[in-house]
């Protein structure tokens, strides 16, 4: 897969990043290099390799699952700038 200049501009627009015409070729090269690396990774033979979540073997500490009443809604919303009936109020962002 190859990224063209129009795709670089589209990605920049979606990311809300100002990109000048002079920067487009450099970014195009960088994105193409990243995609080439990802394509190269897909060719690696991983048959027989177990999936892992960490480079060091570790087990997560488990706690007893205990049912509680909760009743902490007031504590949760006390630092919010705007609340109503223990719900967070946020400014409208879509018209």
Swiss-Prot record:
Coiled-coil portions: none
SUPFAM superfamilies named among the record's database cross-references: Glu-tRNAGln amidotransferase C subunit (SSF141000)
EC numbers for this chain: 6.3.5.-
Single Gene Ontology BP annotation: translation
A Pfam family the protein falls into: GatC
Assigned protein family: Belongs to the GatC family.
NCBIfam families assigned: gatC
Protein name (database record): Aspartyl/glutamyl-tRNA(Asn/Gln) amidotransferase subunit C
Upper lineage: Bacteria, Pseudomonadati, Pseudomonadota, Alphaproteobacteria, Hyphomicrobiales
Protein's gene: gatC
